[in-house]
C-alpha cells in the first residue's frame, strides 16, 4: 500500500511548529527584515556592475571582452572575438547576473574599474602610499648637512638611520668642507656653590644663545686645561677630591660636541694641574722619536766637549763599552724601525695627524714643573720633550703659532719650542710690555700673528694721584721678524677678571670675563677684529651665564670650535 509523502510532510511540519515556543509575530518581523536586507544588497550589486560596464566602454573604447568561463572551450569553435560595434555578437553581458569571469585585453583595466568605484580602497591605498614616502639617502644627507648644530642633534633622535648617517666621518668631512659650520664657544670649569658643577656651557655665536651640557665625567674635577682641534675638545690633567686629599690626574678626556660623545686617549706620563696646552696638525713625516734622537745626539756631542776618548780610558773595559754601545744602537735602530712601520700603517688609516703638547703646571706635591710632554695622534702615545730653558721660570701662558709653541713665564721671558725639530729657542724681545703682576698675561695666535693681552696702569694721569690711578687691559702684537712689541688697542672694560680667557677665530679675537661683585657674578663676551685699523672691541653677550655660578673666574677655561 502506497502512502502519500505530502500529508506526512505537512503533519511533521505542523508537529514541529507546535513544539516551537517562539511567537508568530517575532518570526514574521525577522523574515521581513531579512527580505529587505537581501533586496538592498542585490540593488547595490546591480548598480556597481552597471557603473563598471559604463566605465569600461568610456575608458577603453573598443575593448574586447570574452567569456572565459567553464563553457569557453566548448564554444571556442563557434564563438569568435568581435568588437563592441558589431551589435554585441559574441559578447557576454557585463551587467547581467550570470557569474562569469571577464578578461580585458587592456592590462589592468578590470582592476581599474574596481579601484575607481571603491572609495574605501582608494582611501586605504592613499594612506599606505603616505606611509612609504621617503627621501633617497643622498638627498637626506644633503638636508642634514645644512642643519645648524642644535637641529642636527635633535635629528639624531628621529631614528637610528639618521643618527648613524650623521655620525659618520664622511658626513662630518662633507659638512666641514661645505662651510655649513658656525663658531661655538665652550666654557669649562664653572663653579657652583663653591665646587665644580661639571656642566659645560656652549655659546652659539651666530644665534647669540647659550646652551648647557650636563655631564658627570667632569663633576668634582677642577684645575684642568682644555684645547681643541678637529671638532673635538681635549681636557688635560686636573685635580679632584679623593676623600680627605686631592688627587692629581694624568688622564685625557676627549669630548665631541657634534655627537655628544666622550672617549679617552693615552694618559700622560706625569700628573699635571693647570698645564699649558696646545694642539696643531703635523705632516706625515713627523716623528717624536726622531726629534728625541736628535736631542740625544746633540746632548751626547755637547757632553763630549773637553772630555776623554774611549781609547784613553780604562783599556780593560773598552770591549765592554763597545759591546754595550753596539747593542744599544741595534736596539734603538730596531725599535725605531718598528715605530716607523707602525706610523706608516696608521698614517694610511688616519685622515689628519696632529700633536698635543702639555708643558709646565704643578705636580702631585704642588711643585712647579719645567718639563713637557708631546702626544702623537698616530701612535696614541706620549713622549718626553726637552725641558724649558734654564732660568725661564714658571710658565704662565702659551700658544702655538706657525709651528712654534710660544711660552711666556712669570719672569716676563719668552721662549719658543720648534715642534718639527724638537728644541727650545730663547727669544729676546724689546721693549717688554709693562703689566700688573696680579693679572696673568695671555698669548693668542690670530691669523698667523702673535698677540698678548696684559693689564697695566694707565699712562694718562691727572697729576694728583699719578699714573697708577687706573688699570687697563691692552693688546700687544709681537713682530716675528724684529722681535718688538707694539701696542694695538685698549680693552674698553676695566680689568675686573684676573683670569680673563681669550681665543681666536681667523681674524677675530674673542674674550670671556667673569667676576663677582656685590654678591652677583657678571659675565661679558667681547670680540675684536684685528684687520680693522682701530682694532676696537665690542660687546656681544652680557650676563647670560651668571644665574647659578659663583667665583667662576678662578678656574674657567674656554675652547672654540666650528660645528
UniProtKB/Swiss-Prot annotation:
Disulfide bonds: none
Residue ranges crossing the lipid bilayer per the database entry: none
Xref: SMART domains: FBOX, Kelch
One Pfam family of this chain: Kelch_6
InterPro entries reported for this sequence: F-box-like_dom_sf, F-box_dom, Kelch-typ_b-propeller, Kelch_1
Keywords for the protein's UniProt record, in alphabetical order: Kelch repeat, Repeat
Repeat (Kelch) residue spans along the chain: 184-231, 232-282, 355-402
Record-annotated F-box domain positions: 129-175
Name under which the protein is recorded: F-box/kelch-repeat protein At5g42360
Listed Gene3D superfamilies: 1.20.1280.50, Kelch-type beta propeller (2.120.10.80)
Alphabetized PROSITE patterns for the sequence: FBOX
Domain of life: Eukaryota
UniProt KW Repeat keyword: yes
Keyword Mitochondrion among UniProt keywords: no
